Amino acid sequence: MRQILVLLLFVTLVYGLIRVPLKRQKSIRKTPKEKGKLSHVWTQQGIDMVQYTDSCNNDQAPSEPLINYMDVQYFGEISIGTPPQNFTVIFDTGSSNLWVPSVYCISPACAQHNRFQPQLSSTYESNGNNFSLQYGTGSLSGVIGIDSVTVEGILVQNQQFGESVSEPGSTFVDASFDGILGLGYPSIAVGGCTPVFDNMIAQNLVELPMFSVYMSRDPNSPVGGELVFGGFDASRFSGQLNWVPVTNQGYWQIQLDNIQINGEVVFCSGGCQAIVDTGTSMITGPSSDIVQLQSIIGASAANGDYEVDCTVLNKMPTMTFTINGIGYQMTPQQYTLQDDDGVCSSGFQGLDISPPAGPLWILGDVFIGQYYSVFDRGNNRVGLAPVVPYPPLMNGV
């Protein structure tokens, strides 16, 4: 009888979850790389790939390194307004604002994407404030509006969001997403906006104040994974969740004990800070460490990227990220990316984040694809466990 009750409770929790399917599509980096123009993109954005680094200076306005979004492949759908206007967004735990292009945007990138038309929504209100976000060498700017936002059937009322009227450079022209929905803490939200998930909690729209992310690394799966609001799905991971306290409530920031290569501590020997970030595609770290790491794994700069020989993956070292005393191992097959043309690229990228926020390591999609990640706002902690390979996910299952 006890086993039956436990099973019924599990089924109730699983089917009470709000699931947002994540589609896997071509990344921003993919298109210029296919055209042989990736090096030109880096030059335009002021990113010196020879030095293996991008930088983020906290003395500037709130900043998002543009390189973080270059390889993001996981996107979901939301709608804004009444009647609903649909948008494809990155669900980004590394930022806290929701923004989409405005119909009044004059940038080339906006013309290629869905744009919000406030005059068509009966529930829209103007906030009257402006906002600006720094992306690489340019800034994204616009106005703040208030409207209803729907995420997989969850109706969030009176949500503040950015309507971009100017987007930087030409990089977002090739993006598969229209905008970004931030899932970080309110302290890093620009313009005093309350993040979407905070409003979900305040409006009693979720069972528990947590959400979880599953990302499939199977390139042949048409559905990339899922974002779950209100809890987690234990069928998506093996073993138990290992909980890690959040050390700074801005990003989902945690303590990283050390980083090992083939069992030997090489980086972060005295401990360092890291963030678990669905909006960053790769694993990033201080450029001086990444230069050394790329050399260790045999990656070399080529065609605006860092490539490794696909035929020697079995000879490359194993990486282990030790977090709260638990080792999270990654094989070469897991920390490299293989293109359709058979070229393998390193899953590591240099990124210098200035104090006081940095230096930081960022555990992006390359890491999250191997470890189911739960973001618990109620207890300010992150849960991690090895993913269970799944058949293609079906919407709403």
From Swiss-Prot:
Residues 74-385 form the Peptidase A1 domain. PROSITE patterns: ASP_PROTEASE (PS00141), PEPTIDASE_A1 (PS51767). Gene3D superfamilies: Acid Proteases. The active site is at D92, D277. InterPro entries: Aspartic_peptidase_A1 (IPR001461), Aspartic_peptidase_AS (IPR001969), Aspartic_peptidase_N (IPR012848), PEPTIDASE_A1 (IPR033121), Peptidase_aspartic_dom_sf (IPR021109). Its main location: other. Expressed predominantly in the anterior and posterior adult stomach and at much lower levels in the larval foregut. Residues 17-49 form a propeptide. It is found in: Endosome. Residues 1-16 form the signal peptide. It comes from the Eukaryota. Disulfide bonds join C105-C110, C268-C272, C310-C344. Belongs to the peptidase A1 family. This is Cathepsin E-B.
